[in-house]
Amino acid sequence: LQESEYTPRSGYLAAEDDFFSFMRVHLGDNYLKLAGVSLQHIRLVCFVSRDHYHKISSVKTATVATGLAGVIGNKGCSAISFSFYDSRFCFIGSHLAARIDRKRLEARNQNYRDILKGLAGGFSANGLSDVHHEFDYTFWLGDLNYRIDGISRDEIIAKAGQGDVATLLKHDQLNEQRGLENCFLEFYEPDITFGPTYRFNRGDRTWSEEKMREPAYCDRVLYKTLPMGVVRPLAYQPC
């Protein structure tokens, strides 16, 4: 979760505590909180089935700031890693550089590289951890901020209304940059079968006209495995 900045409910001193508690109550007693971590307002929390909680070990958390001068935490990631039996898992929740222009596109790619480098030090005391290949299963999610480029806002809205997802994905910056091997090497994404999710007005699913920004697939979930690892996505849908 990114941009999680709000006044916490009564009884909570910080939004982080409020959010983590809300998730615990929502999931119910069959799930236990394994770990939670925040980089300013970028939050990641991991819950585990009570039946499997005792099978988990080596829990670690880390954060990497990629905002202004590489130290401001409005952009970057929060991450959690652990072992489940003999398999190593890593979850990375990130918020990358915004805006559509090509300079900002390269900034997003650089954020990706900086996060990998930063997590190598964050998860390892000697800084020698190879996050890209250390974990059996890695899930990278959040507001990656890659945009739809090369067609106008009106065209994007028209294609979305027609259900022409294929055309929109041809102009998707993340797909383009992955194809050029500029970011998210060896990561996979489930098939996108829905229209852009950025940016709707809250509550009514109409396109926001604030700053007249182009609709895009900003929020994504990607995954990678080591050889012999298998991930079978059951669903990939917008909320």
Protein language model regions, located:
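Hydrophobic beta-strand segments of well-ordered beta-sheets in folded domains
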Residues: 1, 89-90, 138-140
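Active-site metal-binding loops of divalent metal-dependent hydrolases
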Residues: 1, 50, 96, 143-144
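Catalytic lobes of large eukaryotic enzymes
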Residues: 14, 18, 22-29, 84, ...
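Structured beta-strand-rich core segments of catalytic domains in phosphoester-bond hydrolases
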Residues: 6-96
